[in-house]
From Swiss-Prot:
Record-linked Pfam families: DALR_1 (PF05746), tRNA_synt_2f (PF02092)
Similarity field: Belongs to the class-II aminoacyl-tRNA synthetase family.
GO terms for biological process, alphabetical: arginyl-tRNA aminoacylation; glycyl-tRNA aminoacylation
Signal sequence segment: none
Lineage, opening ranks: Bacteria, Pseudomonadati, Pseudomonadota, Acidithiobacillia, Acidithiobacillales
Protein name from the UniProt record: Glycine--tRNA ligase beta subunit
HAMAP family, per the entry: Gly_tRNA_synth_beta (MF_00255)
Amino acid sequence: MSAPEDLLLELGCEELPAREQMPLQDAATGIIGQLLDAAGLQFGSIHGYVTPRRLALWIKDVSRQSLPQETLRRGPLVARARDAQGKPTAAAEGFARSCGVSLDDLLTLETEKGPVLAWREVGTAQDSHALLPEIASRLVTSLPLRKRMRWGAGSDSFLRPVRWLLLRQGGQVLDWKMFGLDAGGESFGHRVHHPQAVRISTPAGYAGSLLQAKVMVDFAERRAHISGKMAALADEMAVTPILPEALLDEITGLNEWPVVLAGSFAADYLRVPEEALITVMMQHQRYVPLRGRNERLVPHYLFAANLHSRDTQVVIDGNNRVLRARLADAAFFWDQDRQISLQTRRAALAGVLFQDGLGSILDKTVRLQELAAALSPQFAVDAGDMNRAAALCKSDLLSGLVGEFPELQGIMGGHYARHDGENNRVATAIAQHYLPSGRDDEIPADAHGQCLAIADKLDTLCGFFAIGKVPTGDRDPFALRRAALGVLRIVLDAGVPLNLDEAVTRTLAAYGGAFARNRTEIRSAILDFFQDRMRVYFREEGFRADQIAAVLSRQPHEPLDARQRLEALALFQAEHAAADALAALIKRINNLLRKEVISGDWPIDPQYFMDPVENTLWDYWQALEQPLHAQLAERRYTAALGLLAGLRPAVDQFFDGVMVLAEDPVLRQNRLALLARLQEAFLRIADFSQLQGA
């Protein structure tokens, strides 16, 4: 058998979207491994490469022959293989004939339906050169692309038009045809610095050959290069770069041969709010803003050019011109927008549709006024401030700056509110009320912003659920999952004891009689949706599914309280050796009480205790009851569980010493009533019967 050889696959294409490059590389490395496994080809490590113009895979030590593929074929039941006279049936003979063997050569295989006739076929090993072209094509068609393109006369599709193919194992170029192209043994270098073909002699030499052709194919190495060069240049300039991970990834995805340079703009533009300047630089130009030692923006920025110019100043001047035009627009809108107050703009919101069936944006602000003011006590903020902030929070949607840069909604509203003379509390609430807009965004830092943000998200959630615009499967066109997650994150991270049932009920009430559907049904659907989000959120925080089920069955509507119970329960189970035994004991109590009926609020009468163990448990409970209820009232669940854990010896003795289901109905009711007290205490924290091992 030939020794294994490295495999190299490359698709050369038009510029790939920067944000989709790493997901594409990750998907390709995962899929190629699955395809090689399925084909019976053994292999070593997989290295993925991606640049704006290529996706490549280097797989080490791919075997030259596949492992023999074994196929197990199943035939008729053994009981139906012969007739009453012992002669083979037509079904049995037909199966043997299809396998190319005699009936006596067939195997017997045990199955759920009983023993069946079977035949195990072992295929022959195949040459990897014959298998790999088909594997390469299947890789391309299996990639989970957001959108596929077709070009020319062919039917093959990819994220961008493909211009060349490369498929080589060891020293052999393989016969791969796709996109109307034949794979060769060549790649191509940098579009400007080395547009000629680059001969790739071996898979291991791929990255080095392209480096000589001015292409850094390794995304991680290219990223580290850009980060290091920017840090060094910023250090020389005595500034600090504003370089989030996502921006660094995007810059990396825009460049094959990154050269880091510094540009500048007129200091007069610094009068524009820095959020607008940062948005223009980062999100529209992919430039890196800079802060000086006083933490304020400076009129300089960093950027990566995708080439090494003989005259770098020409490149810098070109980027400066582009940025100057964008900043001039921002400054113009900033000056113009402040001439009209948010209050004046508000009336025009009546002409801006929020959603069919839910009225205008002005209607939404009216609902938010009512809801934010109602929620204000839970955030310890003034209802008047919240009413005012809610009234004005959407007015900046009609401003020129937000029209040009929609991502500044809310943020610019806060600046305009301050300019209009609104107090800082109102301005801050307006500025922060869209947060968190993404999974990794910070929540509003101020209680006023938190209150208005939750009101805004609840109004959206309740409205869309009411008109039947509910997320289904992977589809969530109105980002309702994100809105629900935003509510949960604010409540949990800010420590707000919000009751979702009450909040949703109040939100639906603010819509008045606008809905044809039954409001109770809408409310139930929204609360179920929140419960699903809580399960996912708490799982991501590391809690077990059974712990979450145990807690949410008792506290489904207060996320903060639910998390406090979860933390106490998880700690209790981790630190108490007898936690599982206690849970099993509680399950036994639950089972008894589920089968028996306790007459009303049956009082416990010690005169009916027939055994000392009953007195022991009753005395322990009486001593425990008051401090336990005090801990539960203060939501000190860890301390409460510690107290309840002390019940276990007395409960064990109780079950060992008495027959709970005594024939005497008075004794039986007395004992069941005592157990019901214990059950009720545990249920005030969680349903322990849902815990694993209980």
